[in-house]
Amino acid sequence: MKIKALSKLKPEEGIWLTEVEKPEMGHNDLLIRIKKTAICGTDVHIYNWDEWSQKTIPVPMVVGHEYVGEVVGIGQEVRGFEIGDRVSGEGHITCGHCRNCRGGRTHLCRNTTGVGVNRTGAFSEYLVIPAFNAFKIPAGISDDLASIFDPFGNAVHTALSFDLVGEDVLITGAGPIGIMAAAVAKHVGARHVVITDVNEYRLDLAKKMGVTRAVNVMNEKLEDVMSELGMTEGFDVGLEMSGNPSAFNSMLTNMNHGGKISLLGIPPSDMTVDWNQVIFKGLVIKGIYGREMFETWYKMASLIQSGLDLTPIITHHYKIDDFQAGFDMMRSGMSGKVILDWE
């Protein structure tokens, strides 16, 4: 049976709507009928066919990894799922036999493969994933929100790596993940949450999500904002979401002694860092990759159930046949999360 899918067909800029064979599930898998997908920054990299994509993405391949769907098939060894369950899923498929997997630190598996990156993705009418990777969506959480659990999980993992209660938090990079991390920080009790960027659209979006201050670093100095907020000792926690070298070095300059930094943004490999700031301030820096399996997922659901409102981050919806408009919107930088509807 042929089904619709968005695929990377050629080693050049673009993504194409095509027909592929419906995937077949194994004994430990679920077959999921996709309802909604969201476009990730990774998908934009794949669309643009940048240096990372050229080294990483096999062609041809169905792409996409942010989704919500309904279980329509269950492998014979699978327990705990029923036909009709609403699910999203962890996009990192882990090996199960390395030291970290066996030690319960699955998110640190050295043999990870990625849905829509190294194996068939979710931009399709149907997806097969290991049942281990599926996460049931509680009633009361909308399909829209469920479809962005993957990037929301990046935000939650980054933000909750350190204690935020009563702390002053600096977030560099107001993309959708940075903005969601800011919302999480406010929700769990941070004092001042300051986010920086140069994109006014995204900074306005951050204001709607409740940040203390959204700072365009082209127009304002971070030091002036700190003074305005009555901060005298620097930020306690930094969440680096941009991958921008000047943003990261500005963060180092403005951290308090003993401050803690989570790094999610991917900088150039040759980025220059003022290590004196790290050493003499006694800073702690933690690299973040993906989501903790599955502690982050349970936290995500609980945060929404406890009143965290992420709906402003979803700014655009398109039918799947209009996928090109969705990608154009994401590439413009004038959007939050963009959702593609498969129904």
From Swiss-Prot:
Class of this enzyme: oxidoreductase
Principal place of residence: cytoplasm
UniProt KW Metal-binding keyword: yes
Gene3D superfamilies in UniProt: Medium-chain alcohol dehydrogenases, catalytic domain, NAD(P)-binding Rossmann-like Domain
Name the UniProt record assigns to this protein: L-threonine 3-dehydrogenase
Family as reported in the entry's similarity comment: Belongs to the zinc-containing alcohol dehydrogenase family.
Residues bound to NAD(+): 177, 197, 202, 264-266, 288-289
Organism: Aliivibrio fischeri (strain ATCC 700601 / ES114)
E.C. number: 1.1.1.103
KW NAD (keyword) present: yes
Co-factor requirement: Zn(2+)
